[in-house]
Amino acid sequence: GLIHKVTKVQQLCAFNQDMAGWCEKSCQAAEGKNGYCHGTKCKCGKPLSYRRK
């Protein structure tokens, strides 16, 4: 199911690295945005240098 898929995506990042490019791919598919790894999490459209204002 979808929930398992999301959980799997969480595992694709390690040490801020998009291990297989899947973070990027999933974000492009879902939102048309670049994917960035923050630690072990994949975030769409938010580079590591991103700061909330």
From Swiss-Prot:
Coiled coil: none
GO molecular function, one term: toxin activity
Primary site of residence: secreted
All residue ranges annotated as the BetaSPN-type CS-alpha/beta domain in the record: 10-50
UniProt keyword annotation of Secreted present: yes
Places the protein is found: Secreted
Annotated function: Inhibits voltage-gated potassium channels.
Family label: Belongs to the long chain scorpion toxin family. Class 3 subfamily.
UniProt name for this protein: Scorpine-like peptide
Native organism taxonomy: Eukaryota, Metazoa, Ecdysozoa, Arthropoda, Chelicerata
